């Protein structure tokens, strides 16, 4: 990663060894990662994220000053999904999908579950599917060992996996 002079980048030092341990420990199954993040090049693109991705959350408000409300706010930074894809594949996992949360939940047929849900659950779920909010900004990475997507998933998943493989690890 080459940073520009003055550019700030968030780096999770323990992400690689942790993900490597998780991948090695999986003898058969899926490793599903859901979080805010991007593929490596997009994550560190100085034209978009010159000041990094650190965000401070307090009472449904977001700001960038980690020293403002010490001890009373959550701090978060975006995940380098390119790193996770690379590490998982180095450890023998097969990348089935890297997509946004909304298409993932729709492929999980969340709509069918909402038919019987109460109004509050429907409203909360709508936030997860919002194309300008969480449905757009949260990514889902699915990697597998000894699992054939044909054996495990409904046709909706197979379509999603095929589309995300074509897009490699850069969902648009």
What are these regions, as identified by a protein language model?
Residues 1-172:
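Long, Lys/Arg- and hydrophobic-enriched amphipathic alpha-helices
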């Amino acid at each position: 990663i080459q940073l520009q002079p003055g550019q700030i980048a968030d780096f999770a030092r323990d992400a690689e060894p942790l993900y490597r341990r998780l991948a090695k420990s999986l003898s058969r199954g899926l490793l599903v990662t859901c979080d805010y993040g991007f593929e490596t090049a997009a994550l560190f693109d100085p034209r978009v994220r010159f000041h990094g991705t650190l965000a401070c959350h307090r009472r449904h408000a977001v700001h960038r000053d980690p020293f403002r409300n010490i001890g009373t706010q959550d701090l978060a930074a975006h995940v380098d999904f390119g790193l996770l894809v690379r590490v998982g594949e180095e450890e023998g996992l097969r990348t089935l999908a890297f997509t946004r949360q909304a298409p993932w939940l729709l492929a999980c047929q969340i709509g069918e579950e909402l038919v019987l849900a109460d109004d509050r659950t429907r409203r909360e779920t709508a936030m997860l599917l919002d194309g300008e909010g969480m449905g757009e900004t949260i990514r889902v990475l699915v990697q597998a060992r000894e699992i054939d997507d044909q054996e495990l998933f409904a046709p909706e998943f197979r379509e999603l996996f095929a589309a995300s493989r074509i897009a490699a690890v850069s969902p648009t």
